[in-house]
Amino acid sequence: MSQNSLRLVEDKTVDKSKALEAALSQIERSFGKGSIMKLGANEKIVEVETVSTGSLSLDIALGIGGLPKGRIIEIYGPESSGKTTLALQTIAEAQKKGGVCAFVDAEHALDPVYARKLGVDLQNLLISQPDTGEQALEITDTLVRSGAIDVLVIDSVAALTPKAEIEGEMGDSLPGMQARLMSQALRKLTGSISRSNCMVVFINQIRMKIGVMFGSPETTTGGNALKFYASVRLDIRRIGAVKDREEIVGNQTRVKVVKNKMAPPFKQVEFDIMYGEGVSKTGELVDLGVKAGIVEKAGAWFSYNSQRLGQGRENAKIFLRDNPAVADEIETALRQNAGLIAERFLENGGPDANDSVGLDDA
């Protein structure tokens, strides 16, 4: 009896494997070789290429060393919080590795002088200032399909105005038109983005919902589609000012990883964005170094490997700026301990009401 049942199980297994082989060969005949495969058959599929954000602490918080290529990224926050700065820093980092980048300036507000100060190579940056949202997304689609672009930034979703709205009268009510435009565009783009290994960064603005009694009234523009298609969503906020005596020289910035398909989300980091300079790398090295025990702090003095960096945080930053070899040593040590730092020292923001609200249809 047991032999009969064993033979029956073996026959079923053989039948299943034959049926699977037949199905796979039929799919490959219909749609081409490689249209379906076992995930482990190609090791390259498992590895995700990344581009640094220009912020060491944010790279660590993202869990994979930066923003993933071949994915959709959303950066949103209030006005003057550092959204475009973060996107431009990402472009600069991609260009340092020989990447080709494009900037779709729907807001018509990109400052080339500021971009150059952040390290962007303007000679090799493609820029488009489209008239309508449809034109912007068509240009994006063409660039992505070319397979030649590494990072493409769209600034911003709120400025992607539908053609019907531009051709209409002031005050015309066209509810949900921008949301439909974004939904259709993302359906078309998502496959091309993955195949071309191009990172597409959407910058988005915040609006207030009227009549919200509980939870956060904040929402982002462009409908729900972007929220679902994005692999990483970053919420960036200005939380204070960086002062040199009485003069304000930068912003204290907090970034929360609201969504992350590549690693655990809700990590929260703080860093300085200096005017005309971008993310303060030396400030991050001092702060993260102290947290990780790589940089020693005794009273107001900072030291590394028995070498004094300076008295006070600003002097330590100046020392590291003047001694890049020491700064590189500290950065290497921090990146080697990235997992431990992310787990122990980066604040876990946890989901809040704003992370779970639906986006509006505007």
UniProtKB/Swiss-Prot annotation:
Keyword line: ATP-binding, Cytoplasm, DNA damage, DNA recombination, DNA repair, DNA-binding, Nucleotide-binding, SOS response
Gene Ontology biological-process annotations: DNA recombination; DNA repair; SOS response
Pfam families, per database record: RecA, RecA_C
Coiled coil ranges: none
Upper lineage: Bacteria, Pseudomonadati, Pseudomonadota, Alphaproteobacteria, Hyphomicrobiales
SMART domains listed in its UniProt record: AAA
Name this protein carries in UniProt: Protein RecA
Localization annotation: Cytoplasm
Free-text function comment from the UniProt entry: Can catalyze the hydrolysis of ATP in the presence of single-stranded DNA, the ATP-dependent uptake of single-stranded DNA by duplex DNA, and the ATP-dependent hybridization of homologous single-stranded DNAs. It interacts with LexA causing its activation and leading to its autocatalytic cleavage.
Residue stretches spanning the membrane: none
The keyword Plastid belongs to this UniProt entry's keyword annotation: no
Primary gene name: recA
